[in-house]
Amino acid sequence: QACQEAGVDAFGGPDRAHDSFTNIQKAINYSMTSFFTTGGIRGQKQSMEKFHPRSFNMGFSQEVLKATGGFSGLRFGEDIDMSIRIMAAGFKTCLLPEAYVFHKRRTSFRKFFKQVYNSGMARINLYLLHPHSLKLVHFLPACFVIGCLLCLLGGIFFSWYCLLPLLLLIFVFFIDSWRLNKSIKVAFLSIV
C-alpha cells in the first residue's frame, strides 16, 4: 500500500530509540542516526547520499522480489546489496519518514564496536560486488579517525591548540545528542 501511495516500488523508514531503551542504546542510536556522525545516510530527510532502504525497515513490491530474487547470501550488508540491486533494476525507492521503527541497538560498546567493524567489512564486500556504490561519504569515518589521531599527536608533540578541532567536535556531538535525547548522561555516552 505504501508503495502504491508513494508511487515507488520499494520504501524504507527511519529508525528511532524507544524511551525504554538503555542510555547506552540511546547513545549508540545517536551515533548511528545523527547527521553529524553518518551524513544522514541512515534515514534522514537530508542526506549526502541517495536513500537506500535498510532491512530493519524495508518494504517492496512483489515485482521487486521477482526481479531481484530477494536478499543475497551476504552475512553483512545484505540490505544495502538488496537496495543497490533494486535501483539497478530500474525500480524507485523512497524514504517514508512516518514509517519509523524502534530499532533496538547493541547493549554494550564492545558489541557496538564489533558491529561497526563488520559494517566496514561489509562496505568492502559491497564495493567488490558493486564498484559504483562506493561514495565519498563512505570515507568519512576513516577521515574522522585519522583527523582525531592527528589532533591528539599534534596536541602531544606541538601545541594544545591542535586539540581544538577535536574539542569542538566533542562539544557539537554532546550538544546535539543532549538536544535530541534530552539527557546529559546519554549526551556524555554519545561522545564515547
Task: Walk through the language-model features, giving the residues of each.
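Membrane-embedded multi-pass helical conduit in multi-pass membrane proteins
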Residues: 144-192
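Conserved donor NDP-sugar-binding/catalytic core segment of glycosyltransferases
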Residues: 1-26, 30, 92, 98-104
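Catalytic donor/gating beta->alpha subdomain of glycosyltransferases that bind UDP-sugars
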Residues: 72-134
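A cross-family signal for key residues in well-ordered alpha-helices
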Residues: 66, 84, 146
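A recurrent flexible, glycine/aromatic-enriched loop bordering the glycosyltransferase active site
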Residues: 17, 38-66, 75, 81, ...
